[in-house]
Amino acid sequence: MKIAVCGKGGCGKSTVTSLLAKALARRGKEILVIDSDESNYGLHRQLGMKLPRDFTDYFGGKQNVLNDMMLSKFTHQFFEETWTIDDIPEDYYSLKDGVKLMSSGKIHQANEGCSCAMGTVMTQFIQNLRLTEDQFALMDMEAGIEHFGRGIDNGVDLILIIIDPSYESLQLSKKIGELSESIRKPFYYVLNKVTKENQEMMYEAVWNSSRVAVSLSANSGIMREGLMGKELLEKPDAIENLT
């Protein structure tokens, strides 16, 4: 199953992605985590891994990818055949405890241009990726909804929307739900950073409460590990239930 993890910046996409990946791996599943956010420099730390090499380098680097796109009027196909998790070159992933991490690419310096190259490569990659019943691909998406405009979400099986206790997050989650329905993808909500004080308000304010999968309580251990850039070792019951 291919799952896109979406939401506003700071809502907890990387945290949920990391915790879910670890929980599924403990159940004996083979997990591929795809870092699809060129601005995210923390996901690999939460998984206890090194940041892997940019996957765009496999195709000659960001500039070569852009050149191929422009010369073909943006129709260039980077994948001639379907791929499996085992087909990912060893130089382009990190591996720990049954979880494999790859990265679409990062912005490394000022004025290097947009992230269109990474988006195009990942759109085609996820569409050409074939998984078995015991394999999961979790895509930690960039904040917001631009990835819907790029068509990346067309290649997934399920969309997981993370919501934190803020008006902006609730409003964006409604839009993501609508976009998910427009491309006929099932979606579920994860209420994150939930407390006794905000739980009822969040549940009542969410666009479609029947799509709430779990509520993840605010956790001081997770917050501390995240703040220090350490591997997330907590095992919240809500994440176990989500698996």
PLM region descriptions:
Residues 21, 25, 153, 181:
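Gly/Ala-rich phosphate-binding loop of Rossmann-like dinucleotide-binding domains
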Residues 2-36:
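Walker A/P-loop phosphate-binding motif and the immediately C-terminal alpha-helix
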Residues 76-145:
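Phosphate-binding/switch loop-helix module in NTP-utilizing enzymes
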Residues 103, 160-164, 189-192:
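Conserved beta-strand segments of the P-loop GTPase G domain that flank and frequently precede/overlap
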Residues 181-243:
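C-terminal lobe/tail of nucleotide-utilizing enzymes
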Residues 124, 128-133, 147-167:
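Inter-motif core of Ras-like GTPase G domains
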Residues 23-97:
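N-terminal phosphate/diphosphate-binding loop that engages ATP/GTP or pyrophosphate donors
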Residues 38-39, 107-109, 143-144, 166-167, ...:
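Conserved nucleotide-binding/hydrolysis micro-motifs of P-loop NTPases
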